[in-house]
A protein has these predicted regions:
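Amphipathic alpha-helical polymerization modules
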Residues: 1-141
Length: 141
């Protein structure tokens, strides 16, 4: 396994976790948005990931199993919005209920912490691979 393959895998993890943090931040920022351009309240979003091949076609079986990760799409949460009785709200329906986004702030904060920790882990991998490469270059000196 090449060090560049390890770096590619860790870098793909960094990109995915950055996207996950951005989507989570958007969910938190729009937790009270009752009207969007599409109509209706904001819908919570989640990134959908899939494995991505890293190795070359004629690599060994171990190297062929190496996979990075990439964002496939950003999916909207299918759960129904939360309704609250607020008759004076401009987006209230005839009965006085307003549809609010289905965003759970505790869940979003947990997602943010999880993606932050994963981002840090990928940075640590890159840092360790870099120091290993530097140590290898010093062997011949």
């Amino acid at each position: 396994m090449k060090m560049s393959d390890i770096m590619d895998i860790a870098t793909s993890g960094l990109r995915v976790q950055r996207t996950r943090m951005n989507v989570t931040a958007s969910n938190i920022a729009n937790a009270q948005t009752t009207r969007t351009a599409e109509g209706g309240p904001y819908r919570r979003r989640d990134p959908v990931f899939h494995a991505q091949r890293v190795a070359r076609p004629f690599a060994s079986s171990l190297e062929r199993s190496l996979r990075g990760v990439e964002v496939d799409s950003i999916a909207s949460d299918p759960r129904e919005p939360v309704t609250r009785y607020m008759p004076h709200h401009p987006d209230a329906n005839e009965e006085g209920y307003v549809a609010f986004p289905n965003v759970n702030l505790v869940e979003e904060q947990a997602n943010l912490v999880s993606s932050s920790r994963s981002f840090e882990a990928n940075l640590l991998v890159i840092s360790k691979v870099r120091s290993m490469a530097e140590a290898l270059m010093r062997i011949g000196q």
